[in-house]
UniProtKB/Swiss-Prot annotation:
UniProt cross-references to InterPro entries, sorted A to Z: UPF0178
Organism: Bradyrhizobium sp. (strain ORS 278)
NCBIfam families reported in the protein's UniProt record: PRK00124.1
Signal peptide (residue range): none
Full protein name: UPF0178 protein BRADO3147
Lineage: Bacteria, Pseudomonadati, Pseudomonadota, Alphaproteobacteria, Hyphomicrobiales
Organism domain of life: Bacteria
């Protein structure tokens, strides 16, 4: 295996993740490890590349587990904005299930909007939640995931080459 195809790990915040099957297929195609983290039991394919972690039933147990284990050569898939922020700070690439990448540049505004919407919902000024997940979201996610995998592999290869 060359440094350009060195393995990276995908961490999945699996509770309510609508793209788990897509993640498994892409990861297996690229030969990447997947760690599926949930608050409790979750069914995963029987594949040596895929590992399940039951992080416990605490409020943020799965989020805490993911944040404590990710780093620069990892990709995190989550819709949880505070978790995304923690993982971006750790150097991980982070993607929402709708394909939106979370970056250092976007996290401040994303957190501010999330906090504003939480306040508006709690005051009753805004009702309802996010829009429904669409086939277009699924397609965007797949495209973003492939692009992110290639980018992280290139970054890792460049870092390994510099260390040589």
């Amino acid at each position: 295996m060359t440094t350009e195809t060195a393995p990276i790990t995908l961490y999945v915040d699996a509770d309510a993740c609508p793209v788990k099957d897509e993640i498994y297929r892409v990861a297996i195609r690229h030969g990447l490890a997947v760690i599926v983290v949930a608050g409790g039991f979750i069914r995963v394919p029987d594949d040596p590349l895929i590992t399940r972690v039951a992080a416990g039933s605490g409020m943020d147990a799965a989020d805490d587990w993911i944040a404590e284990h990710t780093g620069p050569d990892d990709i995190v898939i989550t819709a949880d904005i505070p978790l995304a922020s923690r993982c971006v700070k750790a150097g991980s690439a982070v993607i929402a299930p709708n394909g939106k990448p979370f970056t250092e540049e976007s996290m401040g505004m994303t957190l501010a909007v999330r906090n504003l919407m939480t306040d508006l919902r709690s005051s009753g000024e805004v009702t309802g939640g996010p829009r429904s997940f669409t086939p277009r979201d699924r397609s965007t996610f797949l495209s973003t995931l492939d692009t992110t995998i290639r980018r992280v592999q290139r970054q890792r290869a460049a870092r390994i080459q510099q260390q040589s």
